[in-house]
Amino acid sequence: MRIAREEIFGPVLVVIAYGDEHEAVRIANDSEYGLSGGVWSADEAHALAVARRVRTGTVTVNGAPVAFGGPFGGFKASGIGREYGAVDLGSYTEYKTITSDVPMGWRHRFDR
């Protein structure tokens, strides 16, 4: 489907039926672009496993906000490098940011 292969900027919602998870990942990855994507699931561990298979520079899980301290940039034709984060580790590395719906204040547990 053409709309699933193009890089669209704007308020657009695309809904495409798929048979199983493998087909959903195939549809998501069947594009020359890979800036951002999202995975929704009641099972967060499963959603994180699927997010690792989606070839985009940023993947949100269950609508989590973007991690502004993480590297920003895309894969494939969407990738012209990375901004933010410590990402100058090599030109052959594809960095991915995965965000999840972690409760606010989660960082404080490490301050002790």
Question: How would you label these PLM feature ranges?
Answer:
Residues 1-112:
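Conserved C-terminal structural/oligomerization subdomain of aldehyde/semialdehyde dehydrogenase
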